Swiss-Prot record:
Chain positions recorded as ATP 2 binding sites: 639-646
Similarity remark: Belongs to the ABC transporter superfamily. UvrA family.
Subunit structure: Forms a heterotetramer with UvrB during the search for lesions.
PROSITE patterns assigned to the protein according to its UniProt record, in alphabetical order: ABC_TRANSPORTER_1, ABC_TRANSPORTER_2
Subcellular location as annotated: Cytoplasm
UniProt record, GO biological process: nucleotide-excision repair; SOS response
Binding positions (ATP 1): 33-40
GO MF terms held by the record: ATP binding; ATP hydrolysis activity; DNA binding; excinuclease ABC activity; zinc ion binding
Domain (ABC transporter) ranges: 309-587, 607-935
Key word ATP-binding present: yes
Protein's name in the database: UvrABC system protein A
Keywords of the record: ATP-binding, Cytoplasm, DNA damage, DNA excision, DNA repair, DNA-binding, Excision nuclease, Metal-binding, Nucleotide-binding, Repeat, SOS response, Zinc, Zinc-finger
GO cellular component, one term: excinuclease repair complex
Biological source species: Lactiplantibacillus plantarum (strain ATCC BAA-793 / NCIMB 8826 / WCFS1) (Lactobacillus plantarum)
Length: 951
């Protein structure tokens, strides 16, 4: 058959309904559909899984034991499949040694460049350090103008105290007649009386030369003698000119600072040859932070001002503090901030050798009765962190420590030798600290000597290409020194995308998961250009995406639907964007054609007149900004990628509120002051972290509805007859659960060189409960049947019971009606976990003074899901709460009551407030990139509403 198509027959992974799909090869193909409709099941669990499996199966059994063997996806056949590479959103390494530079492998090229064309400069006196052969030294002298007078000196003593009598005797024995001592020429026959308490420099005059063409062999002999006597150093003292220093080592001829031979590993902070000896190549050091140890300085010592010694966890340290303060006369009923400096120092750093008598009896009768030195809370935390063998204790102590820049390497991670080598006047650490856009400018403008340019040309090409790829996927604001663990999922994915573009492969099937996440519309245009470039190399790109611009730029769209979960898994439309837009049954098509759209709000809420004000925010790239966050409104923070949105909201505002309201120990980013916190009662951070880390956590347990369901089953007649209580219906405790699988429903079978296999438990057949428990039914369904219901099915089933129905309805309201109540939390995506948290907030009693923070809640959402999400957020705001979100999606941005737009650019070019106000006001600000993209959307939607039929 023709090789221009990938043909899938009978795909049944997860909720796919035995579908047949034909995808054109060497095209940009978007798979879209509602959240949970089966997009990822088709793209990742079918296409990628089969492409990867076929490759792994071609390897030997020995190799497979290291790679693992993937299960064959549930599909009849796939024809025309290429080798598959998945570029997903899973964040990169959590290793603190991984940086953007190491992940992209640009660091390897930088290290090679500095090793091959770098020029060592002595950090002590600024003298160039070079390694030269005798032939190079002779060539250098012969390039001087003819008749130039000079003398060849051998520096045998450099800036050393002493009389040096043995040195002068040695010079006489060698047969030399002249010597230069502290800059003055003397005859060796003179008697030298040097002050032994002063530093002296002694240089032997090897030869006096007038430069002319026939003196090459004489110069050779002179330099060899000079180098032999001094251990590798020589000076050409040009009469009437500057002296020329020579060395056959990489060492400073003045102070002796040694670099050694330049090798790439010298410039690696992960190698002992290059790493800073103080921080071991991390660039940071952990220090106990007073602000974390005493987070609320208005508290007294008796009230628990010292967080690590809080009486909640143990009475030992509070009792020790009490007895120490009594005997050292430190008041415990005075706010910490009002204690004298001396008392604060004693509490923090100890009693400086003074002892106190300590008597303590624990709950088990153990007695400690000693005269002890009070060590202070900071010393105590530091000691326990470094001495403990317990991971738990180390994690607890780590909460009171902060990462400070290493003062030895100033955060560059490398030792003095590596940082002394310059290319273009800069060391490798300084260049790695530049934003990628500026770094690209540095290498484009780099001026090198003719010889160095020949060596550097291929290296520079690789560096420039890779930096350009990163810039083109919207990452110009990042630095190569940025730690990989601080990257968002979208940033990590785009870094891998740039790496793949740099590989220049063709004939590959790339599968991407929402690469537009975290990208402003301005940066998204560049990303689409990069995707097209990969396609034009002869690759097939399959992108799971909801972004309208990406869909319109695609060659082909596959729309999966019509609903989510059991209601999805079918192909609703497939074709070019124009063909899909004409499809009546495709929800995506209706949004593409404009027949369906998210309407503008009828009015913008004015809020309650109160606000939270942050002044002097200066963390990362924030430029000492003052920001007002109005309360009782739907507030959206916008700005191009890297403009400072996450820094402002997550690192400053969220941590300030968490510290003041929740007594959280996490240190906020730099700011001067905060006001207005008294106007809110509760901070709720709804992020995309998992709702549970074990398969036993599920939507029913997280939302709390499972407690109500277990109560209901315990009240049935059958349960009462058998004496079953609520605990009988838990799969976490003995009694009602299946003991063969301990309530997991599955068993793990280890398979040597094959991956572990998980099979349903043969006793309970995956139902998690024993047969006696499953005999108890409510309306013909047992507890396992209920856990297999989707939220939508469960709403109908529990219709007569308001307490259960209300909680389940919130799951449907946030677009999770397709999720099964017993679905393991580990299988939920980040977006699903975030909406699960939203749902659990909706059914709580609202005080009207909650402050909700969400970071990009539209991740993984179709336009129809976004419409539903906006409705949910509106419900929270209508109840009097404040919702603050970071978002790029223009449907959400246009629905806000108030916008805070940061920028104007990313990285160093950002960090200021470009515009604030309603979407209409921001759209009129010419300097705002958000406003430029928002204005046509507002105009389009007003026109749509004007022509839409009356409801």
């Amino acid at each position: 058959m023709a090789n221009d198509k990938i043909v899938i027959h009978g795909a049944r992974a997860h909720n796919l309904k035995d579908i047949d799909v034909t995808i054109p090869r060497d095209k940009l193909v978007v798979i879209t559909g509602l959240s949970g409709s089966g997009k990822s099941s088709l793209a990742f669990d079918t296409l990628y899984a089969e492409g990867q499996r076929r490759y792994v199966e071609s390897l030997s059994a020995y190799a497979r034991q290291f790679l693992g063997q993937m299960q064959k996806p549930d599909v009849d056949s796939i024809d025309g499949l290429s080798p598959a590479i998945s570029i997903d959103q899973k964040t990169t390494s959590k290793n603190p040694r991984s940086t953007v530079g190491t992940v992209t492998e640009i660091n390897d090229y930088l290290r090679l460049l500095w090793a091959r064309v770098g020029e060592p400069i002595c950090p002590n006196d600024g003298t160039p350090i070079a390694s030269q052969t005798v032939e190079q030294m002779v060539d250098r002298i012969q390039k001087l103008p003819e008749r130039t007078k000079l003398q060849i000196l051998s520096p045998i003593v450099r800036q050393k105290k002493g009389e040096h009598k043995k040195i002068f005797e040695k010079i006489k024995r060698e047969g030399f007649v002249r010597v230069r001592v502290d800059g003055d020429i003397h005859d060796i026959s003179e008697t030298f009386e040097l002050n032994k308490n002063q530093q002296h420099t002694i240089e032997i005059v090897i030869d006096r030369i007038v430069v002319k063409s026939g003196d090459r062999s004489r110069l050779f002999d002179s330099f060899e003698a000079a180098l032999r006597l001094s251990g590798g150093y020589a000076i050409a003292d040009v009469i009437g000119g500057e002296p020329i220093m020579f060395s056959e080592h990489y060492a400073c001829p003045i102070c002796g600072f040694t670099v050694g031979e330049l090798e790439p590993r010298l410039f690696s902070f992960n190698a002992p040859q290059g790493a800073c000896p103080d921080c071991e190549g991390l660039g940071i050091k952990l220090e106990v932070d007073e602000d974390l140890v005493v987070p609320d300085k208005s508290l007294t010592l008796a009230e628990g001002a010292l967080a690590p010694w809080n009486p909640i966890s143990s009475q030992y340290y509070p009792e020790m503090l009490k007895q120490a303060c009594e005997q050292l006369e430190i008041p415990m009923d005075v706010p910490y901030e009002d204690l004298s400096k001396a008392d604060q120092q004693t509490v923090l750093y100890g009693s400086n050798g003074k002892t106190f008598h300590f008597h303590y009896q624990n709950d088990f009768g153990g007695v400690r009765d000693v005269d002890a030195v009070f060590e202070g809370v900071i010393n105590n935390v530091d000691r326990r962190y470094h001495e403990t063998n317990s991971d738990f204790t180390r994690d607890v102590m780590r909460k009171y420590m902060t990462e400070l820049t290493c003062q030895t390497c100033h955060g560059f991670r490398l030792n003095r030798k590596a940082l002394s080598v310059k290319v273009g006047g800069e060391h490798i650490g300084m260049v790695s600290d530049l934003a990628i856009g500026k770094e690209l400018d540095f290498f484009n403008e780099l001026s090198l000597s003719e010889q160095s340019l020949v060596i550097a040309k291929p290296i520079l090409k690789e560096i420039r290409d890779r930096l350009s790829f990163l810039q083109n996927v919207g990452l110009a604001y990042l630095t190569l020194s940025r730690s990989a663990r601080t990257l968002s999922g979208g940033e990590a994915q785009r870094i891998r995308l740039a790496t793949q573009i740099g590989s220049n492969l063709s004939g590959v099937l790339y599968i991407l998961d929402e690469p537009s996440i975290g990208l402003h519309q301005r940066d998204n245009d560049r990303l689409i250009g990069s995707l097209k470039k990969m396609r034009d190399l002869g690759n097939t790109l399959i992108v799971v995406e909801h972004d309208e611009d990406t869909m319109r730029a695609a060659d082909y769209i596959v729309d999966i639907g019509p609903g989510a979960g059991e209601n999805g898994g079918e192909v609703m439309a497939a074709g070019t964007p124009k063909q899909v837009a004409r499809s009546r049954k495709s929800l995506t098509g209706q949004y593409l054609s404009g027949k369906r759209f998210i309407p503008l709000p009828e009015t913008r809420r004015p809020g309650n007149g109160k606000k939270i004000r942050i002044t002097g925010a200066a963390e990362n790239n924030l430029k000492q900004i003052d920001v007002d966050f109005p309360l009782g409104e739907f507030v959206v923070v916008t700005g191009v990628s890297g403009s400072g949105k996450s820094t402002l909201v997550n690192d400053v505002l969220k941590r300030v509120l968490a510290q003041k309201l929740n007594r959280n120990s996490e240190k906020p980013g730099k700011y001067k002051s905060v006001s207005g916190i008294k106007n809110i009662e509760r901070l709720v951070n709804i992020d995309q972290s998992p709702i549970g880390r074990t398969p036993r956590s599920n939507p029913a347990t997280y939302t709390g509805v499972f407690d109500n369901i277990r109560d209901l089953f315990a009240q049935t007649n059958e349960a009462k007859l058998r004496g079953y209580k609520k605990g009988r219906f838990s799969f976490n405790t003995k009694g009602g659960r299946c003991e063969a699988c301990h309530g997991d429903g599955i068993l793990k079978i280890e398979m040597n060189f094959l991956p572990d296999v998980f099979v349903p438990c043969e006793v309970c057949h995956g139902k998690q409960y024993n047969s006696e428990t499953l005999e108890v039914e409510y309306k013909g369904k047992n507890i396992a049947d209920v856990l297999q219901m989707t939220a939508s099915e469960a709403v109908k089933f529990f219709e007569p019971i308001p307490k259960i129905r209300r909680k389940l309805q919130t799951l449907v309201d946030v677009g999770l009606g397709y999720v099964k109540l017993g679905q393991p939390a580990t299988t939920l995506s980040g977006g699903e976990a975030q909406r699960m948290k939203l749902a659990s907030e909706l059914h709580k009693q609202q005080s009207g003074k909650n402050f909700y923070i969400l970071d990009e809640p539209t991740t993984g959402l179709h336009s129809e899901d976004i419409r539903r999400l906006i409705g949910v957020l509106d419900r929270l705001v209508d109840a009097g709460n404040t919702v603050l979100i970071i978002e790029h999606n223009l449907d959400v941005v246009k629905s806000a009551d108030y916008l805070i737009d940061l920028g104007p650019e990313g990285g160093d070019g950002g960090g200021t407030i470009v515009a604030t106000g309603t979407p209409e006001q921001v759209a009129e600000v010419a300097e705002s990139y958000t406003g430029q993209y928002l204005k046509p959307v507002l105009e389009r939607d007003r026109a749509r509403e004007a022509t839409a039929p009356a409801k």
